[in-house]
């Protein structure tokens, strides 16, 4: 094949001009000179001779200078030194839309000397497929560096699950609040498993955040759409009591809740007590079990009775439990406030609720819904087996078939069961620095470029990498301000 020389002139400057393509050029990436300042991860556009306008993203920026070590020392001594410098950028090609509206990448290289410009809003929206679908979409924020709204498809989130991943203090509960606000606007049925009592603030109107005008968000409260239940209404005042019956628990289940180290010793006595009670009634309490054991007058039962007294004090069991159809109400959001509840009791609550919701959803007795799980590493851990591990694996693999979606929230991605995390097709990733967590995230996210993976540990507060949820590729998004009051602020030791 003969090579053909062509002349390129410098009359390309104009609005948004960045530089020109040079050097070795391919159809999927190229280098360009940088005349006007451009930032890493910024979108640019360039005209391809057969494909028309093509969108790209700046992956790397480099400044080359002729300043040697010796001359740098002169600068340090205050002597004037002339420094010549050149700035260049590596651009990865995202593509263009063909006549069928499919995203395509050119099959031939770009031409040397072709001008590179900052991408226009229309080009970004067209190529990335960012439509303002307010009917089916959750407004997450603005494309980083551009005033382009980003919407996540709600149906895709329910059908294919969501994960929100961040380091401690990275803003995961804040963005979870943003997502839940959007679900409430669209009247999606939600249940939130809230170990720290952070989400009750969704009932309260927030303050006008700095820079909120860019996002067109106004403070709002959702008190009418929310109900709150808790196993401990003494700590979590204003919550409705959450109660369970004992009828579905066998002797081994009850002993596991007591944390007893003498399971074998107590198992026979407890089974005998349960058999006696079940012959008389289906509705019995921990106090009823204690009374049966006390009547036996067996000294070996003394420690078992003490352990059952602990369960009785928790007051989570009753003759009549809370019905699931009280918790799951169409178009409403229910918060299960577990603040102050011991970890073993939290496991019981989460396991019982998640199992019941899945079974009733399969039967169509409760509406399609989202189950939001905060501190997910505590309820579906990668290492070890706890009561709720099995149901979350089942929900992750089968929940989508029955319209039960998960929102998995954690600051320790590496500690969440990989079978659960890998099933989350919509991922919202904030700043993460732990190497093990980064490895877990990168292995679970499709389409993440090497440069974007590097960016995870450098993300500023308020910026997230989002993928799935109707997005065709991972995008960096400035998260919109909350409409409601954020309930997950860190406690200040020294007040302002």
Predicted regions and their residues:
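Conserved ATP-driven motor cores of ASCE-family P-loop NTPases powering translocation/secretion/packaging/pilus
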Residues: 2, 394-478
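Long, basic/Gly/Ser/Thr-rich N-terminal segments
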Residues: 2-122
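Phosphate-binding and hydrolysis-coupling loops of NTP-dependent motor/remodeling domains
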Residues: 2-8, 16, 43-45, 89-96, ...
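P-loop NTP-binding catalytic core
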Residues: 99-157, 476-478, 482-483, 488-490
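The Walker A/P-loop phosphate-binding site
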Residues: 131-159, 163, 313-342
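Glycine-rich phosphate-binding loop of nucleotide-binding enzymes
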Residues: 135-230, 466, 496
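P-loop NTPase motor domains
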Residues: 182, 197, 201, 207, ...
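Hydrophobic residues in beta-strands of the RecA-like P-loop NTPase core, especially within AAA+ ATPase
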Residues: 193, 373, 409-410
